[in-house]
């Protein structure tokens, strides 16, 4: 895209269509556009960095919940520990599907733990143990909701429209500006165009941290969730 801008600027220079004289106002316009883009990028990166923390927290909660349930089962073997493990396995695999694709809803899997909590209550498991597991269940649900929100909601959509508009206006202004020396100015126009266009593309990409696996190199990795899935899978034989 930046190469196209440079080529177009060169063509306009050859044709002599550069009616705008270079002035100090150009520096002010470029600074203002850069500020708006930087503000939007910093806000988007904040959500992206939060998204990077969520998989590790979710994986830790999943493994910890199973470990707690297995520990409880040793003293109170009154509930289906294999069923509980299977449900945690569904939650871990379901989170990956939910984050990558909107067609799957892991909330039903998370709520599927409630019957096991009821079995624990009937089996005489101390209330504080069950309360802790329920709190962890809420934490799983909170993580799922946060990921879903970040995936679907764009940060100040009007600001994104503004950023794209002013970048287009700025590039158009630079194209019709008589810049001296020309070739040095041509390089600067190409550099400015490249930076601003790349920043807009970066904002669009990182505003959706969880793409389908392998779609972009900037996706948030879910390898810790896969580790939790493998951990639960390895525990299957131990509960038999």
Model region roles, listed by residue range:
Residues 33-36, 43, 191-198:
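Hydrophobic alpha-helical membrane-associated segments
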Residues 52-69, 84-99, 220-235:
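Alpha-helical membrane-embedding segments
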Residues 65-157:
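Structured inter-helical modules in multipass membrane proteins
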Residues 16-38, 105-106:
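Acidic, low-complexity proline/glycine-rich segments
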Residues 35-55:
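Transmembrane signal-anchor/signal-peptide helices with a preference for the extracytoplasmic
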Residues 1-25, 149-240:
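Alpha-helical transmembrane anchor segments
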Residues 17-20, 43, 132-142, 220:
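Juxtamembrane loop-helix boundary motifs flanking transmembrane segments in multi-pass membrane proteins
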Residues 19, 48-60, 79:
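Juxtamembrane membrane-water interface segments immediately C-terminal to a transmembrane helix
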């Amino acid at each position: 895209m930046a190469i196209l801008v440079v080529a177009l600027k060169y063509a306009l220079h050859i044709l002599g269509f550069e009616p705008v004289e270079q002035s100090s106002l150009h520096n002010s316009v470029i600074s203002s556009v850069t500020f708006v883009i930087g503000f939007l990028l910093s806000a988007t990166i904040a959500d992206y960095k939060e998204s990077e923390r969520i998989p590790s927290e979710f994986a830790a909660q999943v493994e910890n919940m199973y470990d707690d349930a297995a520990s409880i089962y040793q003293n109170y073997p009154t509930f289906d520990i294999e069923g509980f493990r299977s449900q945690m396995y569904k939650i871990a695999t379901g989170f990956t599907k939910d984050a990558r694709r909107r067609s799957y809803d892991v909330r039903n899997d998370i709520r599927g733990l409630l019957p096991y909590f009821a079995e624990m209550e009937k089996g005489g498991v101390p209330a504080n143990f069950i309360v802790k597991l329920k709190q962890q269940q809420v934490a799983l649900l909170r993580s799922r909701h946060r990921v879903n929100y970040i995936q679907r909601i764009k940060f100040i959509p009007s600001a994104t429209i503004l950023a794209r508009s002013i970048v287009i206006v700025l590039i158009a202004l630079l194209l019709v500006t008589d810049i001296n020396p020309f070739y040095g100015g041509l390089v600067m126009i190409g550099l400015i165009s490249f930076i601003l266009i790349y920043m807009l593309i970066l904002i669009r990409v990182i505003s959706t941290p969880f793409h389908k696996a392998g779609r972009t190199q900037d996706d948030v990795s879910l390898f810790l969730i896969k580790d939790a899935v493998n951990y639960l899978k390895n525990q299957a034989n131990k509960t038999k």
